């Protein structure tokens, strides 16, 4: 249930914003993401943001959301590290969005906010790397827990 609720934390505000205030989609996505990672009621110590990011992606573009999930599953099956899968999936979405105009058009057919969307996805990627800094250290030291399949 935590996974579903965290996905909804990203999905719901972006969908509402798309329908009522489309010019604020990027701001809505950013605030939902930051609110998950840095909640003030938990002294700014929240989650890693991956599920919320997935919810945001699904709200912006199902194709990018499914790309993220597909990449996560493939990397998880190969390496069995959730953290590595999350970071690599985020990088994959970022790279596809930067180099494939069709990916940006899937988010916004009018192509009005293309640069903003790319910037927001870049910020999300940086923040996901930031929230995984302990995991990165564990991966380097070979102490990261593997996913049990």
Describe every region a protein language model picked out:
Residues 25-30, 54, 66-70, 87-91, ...:
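Hydrophobic alpha-helical transmembrane segments
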Residues 10-27, 58-65, 99-120:
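Helix-coil boundary and interhelical linker segments in multi-pass alpha-helical membrane proteins
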Residues 17-21, 50-79, 91-101:
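Interfacial segments of multi-pass membrane proteins
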Residues 1-9, 38-51, 78-88, 131-149:
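Interhelical loop and helix-boundary elements at the membrane-water interface
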Residues 107-149:
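C-terminal membrane-associated helical module and adjoining short loops/tails
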Residues 14-15, 41, 77, 94, ...:
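Membrane-embedded alpha-helical segments of multi-pass transporters/permeases
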Residues 11-12, 22-45, 50-59, 68, ...:
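Anionic-ligand binding patches
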């Amino acid at each position: 249930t935590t996974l579903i609720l965290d996905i909804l934390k990203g999905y719901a505000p972006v969908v509402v914003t798309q329908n009522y205030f489309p010019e604020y989609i990027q701001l809505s996505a950013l605030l939902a993401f930051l609110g998950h990672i840095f909640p003030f009621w938990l002294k700014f110590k929240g989650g890693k943001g991956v599920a919320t990011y997935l919810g945001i992606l699904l709200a912006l573009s199902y194709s990018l959301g499914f790309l993220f999930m597909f990449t996560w599953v493939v990397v998880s099956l190969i390496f069995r590290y959730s953290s590595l899968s999350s970071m690599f999936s985020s990088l994959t979405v970022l790279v596809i969005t930067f180099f494939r105009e069709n990916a940006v058009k899937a988010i916004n057919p009018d192509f009005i906010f293309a640069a903003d969307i790319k910037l927001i996805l870049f910020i999300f990627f940086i923040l996901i790397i930031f929230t995984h800094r302990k995991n990165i250290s564990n991966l380097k030291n070979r102490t990261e827990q593997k996913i049990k399949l």
